[in-house]
Amino acid sequence: MDIIKGNLDGISKPASNSRIRPGSRSSNASLEVLSTEPASCKVDTASNLNSGKEDHSESSNTENRRTSNDDKRESCSEKIKLAEEGSDEDLDLVQRQIIPECSDEHKLEELDSQLQDAIQKMKKLDKILAKTQRREKEIKKQGLEMRIKLWEEIKSAKYSEAWQSKEEMENTKKFLSLTAASEETVGPSHENEDSFSSVFHTQIPPEEYEKQMQKLSKDFTCDVERNESLIKAGKKPFSNTEKIELRGKHNQDFIKRNIELAKESRNPVVMIEREKKRLVELLKDLDEKDSGLSSSEGDQSGWVVPVKGYALAVTQHQQLAEIDIKLQELSAASPAISSFSPRLENQNNQEPDLDGEKNMEVTPGEKVLRNTKEQRDLRIRLREIDEKLRMMKENVLQSTSRLSEEQLKCLLDECIVKQKSIIKLSSEGENEDIEDVIPMFPQLSRSIISKLLNESGTKVQKTEAEDADMLESAEREASKGYYLTKALTGHRMSEALVTEVENMKCLQFSKNDIISDTKDYFMSKTLGIGRLKRPSFLDDPLYGITVSLSSEDQHLKLNSPEKTKADEQETKDAAEECKEP
């Protein structure tokens, strides 16, 4: 085969070697003619799959399909042969036609298989529905049979002696009268009725479907026969319009019924006027039957046996009377309780009347009302007693002298104010004492203090001889009586020593030496006296203070204890004066 025109880039090499003429174009692409074997394999696999899914009953359909597939294959092979003989353009057209035909075949096969599966499922479901419907029908028939037997037994036992009590007879009569309509419906004529409960309101049972179709065909033929003359005259039939009018009437009745129901939607039980009339008729029948039974029997055994209500015993009346007497004795002065006594008398007077009325025949309703009234009166009396007791307690509490809460608060406030004033006075006195004790001395610099120390050192050396002479002369002139008087009278010697220290001004000897000398001297004098007490100068505050005459500060400390002692005495006196009032 020689290539004259066209590009064959998208085509593979040919099966047979092609001869190329020197005048023709040379192309790298080649043409390959495919055989029919792979297509047949694909079709066979698809047919095998479809045959596996289908039942044995559908084998004939598969054979027909195979024949059609074989015909298609043959047509494809013929087209390929023609393409081999023809030109390149013919090959392109043939290939374009072959590809969509094959794809359409596969799609159709898939759709057929899906439809067949769906049909099989529908058949299975139809069988299941038919079984369930048969079962329901059987159960309903059994229920109807049992109901018929029950009604027959009730009717047979209505006038028998099996009913021992009259209440059971009345109940059965009422039950039969209420369910008379349902009893009438149940009968041999209604046993064979088809009680089909449809899932959808438009569903029709399969058994009646053929009957309805026959009826429709008959109606259609009748309408056609009636309207043949009209059809010939060129007029339209009115059978459909008549049917539409009937449906419209039915719909209007339905609308009216809905309107009537909507009017009485507020009522607990929605009923139409027709239903109300029926109910009134049934109730009238029941009232007539009840009146006939009561007149025929003449007994009151059906009524409830009258029972006496709650009544106070004689002892309880006596106890209440005693309580009232005690209350009158306790609160004779109060007018509220005095008004309570006439009620007791009235009630006691009414008691025999009540007893007389009880002997009379009373219906159950009146007795219940009487009992409720008596209970109400008793509750009112108990409330009045509680109120009077509460009033008595309040009077007793008010008679006793008790301070109110406001008075107690005022007293507490006054006490707190007094305590605060005392504390303030004592604190102010202590502060004043401390301020008085603290000396207001001028602060000296270190240079001045050093000068004073140097001057004191020179003066001490000059006065040592004079002091020694003065002490010796004092010891010689002193006598025993003089020192004893000094020891007994007080701390005169201490004052003398203070004056001597002030006069000496910065002597360089320690106070410990002075204290040791004076202590030894006075103790030696006092040991000789048996009954004398400890001298008062030993308790002097100056006796325990260390004196260092090397600095002026220590010299100034000697004057401060005397002032503190005086201040302490003044504070003590002030505190005693505050306590006395």
Swiss-Prot record:
Ranges of compositional bias, category Basic and acidic residues: 52-77
Keywords, in A-Z order: Coiled coil, Phosphoprotein
Record carries keyword Phosphoprotein: yes
Entry-annotated residues carrying Phosphoserine: S87
Biased composition (Polar residues): 14-30
Segments forming a coiled coil: 103-153
InterPro entries in UniProt: Fsip1 (IPR026246)
Positions of the UniProt region annotated as Disordered: 1-77, 338-370, 553-581
Pfam families reported in the protein's UniProt record: FSIP1 (PF15554)
Family named by the database record: Belongs to the FSIP1 family.
Name of the protein this chain belongs to: Fibrous sheath-interacting protein 1
Source organism: Macaca fascicularis (Crab-eating macaque)
